[in-house]
C-alpha cells in the first residue's frame, strides 16, 4: 500500500516501473554527492561515521539512526546564503540521512528488493524530515551508481516520490524533484511536480535537470497559468516566465514512459 500525505486532487500518480533485468550492484561504491561528503566531514563527523559504520554492519540499525540524525548533526540549511530555510537545496540532516541510505545500500549488498522494501518502510514510518532524508538518499543512490539504482529501488522510489508530490509541505515536494526524479519520473508526473513548485512559491532551482527535461507542454502549462493569474489580478511568479521559454520539444528522454 502506497502512503499518502495529503488529499491534493491534482496530484500526479506513480508510474509502474519495469522489473529489473540485471542483478543489483552496491550503489555506494562510487564517490557520494558533495552534500553527503560535507555532512560526513562536518562538526558531528564522529557520530555520523560511527552511525554509518553501524548501518553497514547491520541494516536494521538504520531504523534507529535515521530518526536521530537531526538531533545529532543539526537541522541547518546546507546553503544558508541562498537557501536560508533549506527547502531548495536541503539541510544538514537531509545530507546525513542521505549518507545513511548509501550505507544501507552497502549493507543490503546485491539484495535490491530487500533494500527497496527497507527504504519504503523507513519512509512510511518517518516524519517529514525522515521522509525528506529517504528522498535525498534516492538522489544520492542515483548519483553514486553508474547505471542508476537497481530496478526494485527505482520502482519504490517512484512510488515514494509520487507520495511526496501529493504533500503540501514545500520541503518534501522540493526533495522529490532531485536527480532521482529527473532520471526516473515519467514526463507527465514530472511536469505537474514542476508546476506545483510554482504554485507553492518554491524556487525552481530545486528541480534537477530542469532545462534538459522542460518541453513544449510544460511551456504551455506555464503560459496558461500566467494568463489565469493576470486575469485574476494576481502576481505572476518569475519562474513562470522561465518555464514559458521551454524548448519546443523534450531535449532528453530519461523516464521509461511518457504519459500515464
What are the residue ranges of the model-derived segments?
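Eukaryote-skewed repeat-based solenoidal scaffolds used as protein-protein interaction platforms
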Residues: 96, 101-232
Amino acid at each position: 500500500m502506497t502512503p499518502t500525505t495529503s488529499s491534493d486532487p491534482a496530484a500526479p500518480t506513480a508510474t509502474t516501473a519495469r522489473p529489473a533485468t540485471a542483478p543489483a550492484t552496491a550503489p555506494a561504491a562510487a564517490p557520494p554527492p558533495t552534500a553527503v561528503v560535507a555532512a560526513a566531514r562536518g562538526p558531528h563527523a564522529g557520530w555520523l561515521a560511527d552511525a554509518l559504520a553501524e548501518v553497514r554492519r547491520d541494516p536494521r540499525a538504520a531504523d534507529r539512526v535515521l530518526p536521530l540524525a537531526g538531533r545529532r548533526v543539526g537541522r541547518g540549511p546546507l546553503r544558508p546564503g541562498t537557501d536560508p530555510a533549506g527547502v531548495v537545496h536541503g539541510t544538514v540532516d537531509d545530507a546525513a540521512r542521505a549518507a545513511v541510505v548509501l550505507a544501507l545500500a552497502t549493507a543490503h549488498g546485491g539484495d535490491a528488493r530487500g533494500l527497496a522494501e527497507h527504504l519504503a518502510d523507513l519512509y512510511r514510518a518517518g516524519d517529514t524530515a525522515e521522509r525528506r532524508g529517504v528522498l535525498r538518499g534516492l538522489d544520492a543512490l542515483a548519483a553514486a551508481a553508474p547505471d542508476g539504482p537497481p530496478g526494485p529501488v527505482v520502482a519504490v522510489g517512484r512510488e515514494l516520490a509520487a507520495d511526496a508530490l501529493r504533500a503540501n509541505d514545500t520541503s518534501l515536494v522540493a526533495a522529490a524533484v532531485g536527480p532521482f526524479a529527473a532520471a526516473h519520473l515519467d514526463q507527465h508526473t514530472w511536469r505537474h511536480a514542476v508546476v506545483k513548485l510554482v504554485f507553492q512559491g518554491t524556487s525552481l532551482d530545486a528541480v534537477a535537470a530542469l532545462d534538459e527535461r522542460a518541453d513544449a507542454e510544460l511551456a504551455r502549462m506555464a503560459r496558461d497559468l500566467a494568463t489565469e493569474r493576470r486575469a485574476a489580478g494576481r502576481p505572476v511568479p518569475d519562474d513562470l516566465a522561465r518555464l514559458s521559454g521551454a524548448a519546443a520539444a523534450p531535449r532528453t528522454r530519461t523516464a521509461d514512459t511518457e504519459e500515464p
